[in-house]
Amino acid sequence: MSPSFAIVFIFVCLFVFFGLVVFIGAPYVPSHKKDVKRAFDHFGLGDLDTLVDIGSGDGIILRIASRYGARSIGYEINPILVGISRLLSRRDARVTILLQNAWTANLPQSTTIVYAFAVNRDESKLVSILQQAANRLQKPLKLLCYGSPFKHISAADTFEAYHLYIFQPLQPKNA
């Protein structure tokens, strides 16, 4: 294999894994540790929580949540980022990283809070998934979004660029 072919192949793979993912979810944007820690302090993340990160990237949110005592589960569709995240989190028993599309996954029963990088185009999808999960699990679920506030529902709390939404389970129609 020629060196130029190898370079082109690497760039094509990187484009596929990083570029095309944007059409399915948010782009990979690394989170700043100090901002995440301040947000977790503000919103009171702790050892009774299970945080699910939709689009967990390199796993920094998961590892910080674990330091707060929370169990953390990350869904990521980019296999390169899953590998990096698993490597960086390998010694942390409270961190789980799944190579899976979060849009098609069922949130675990233990979920208390979902973390997402907010992209306005995904608002209705996120709201629908969280409401369905709250109904299925029959408990309130929190959604902590970094970035743009939602346009169609109000945040229960806001801290800097973080917006907290709470989804209450709706009563079944036959109840």
Regions found by a protein language model. Name each.
Residues 1-46:
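S-adenosyl-L-methionine
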Residues 47-57:
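Conserved class I S-adenosyl-L-methionine
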Residues 58-70:
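Conserved SAM-binding loop of SAM-dependent methyltransferases across substrates and taxa
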Residues 71-76:
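Conserved SAM-binding motif I beta-strand of class I
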Residues 85-86:
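Conserved SAM-binding loop
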Residues 92-102:
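Conserved SAM-binding strand-loop segment of SAM-dependent methyltransferases
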Residues 121-134:
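A short, conserved alpha-helix within the catalytic core of class I
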Residues 138-149:
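Conserved beta-strand signature within the Rossmann-like core of class I S-adenosyl-L-methionine
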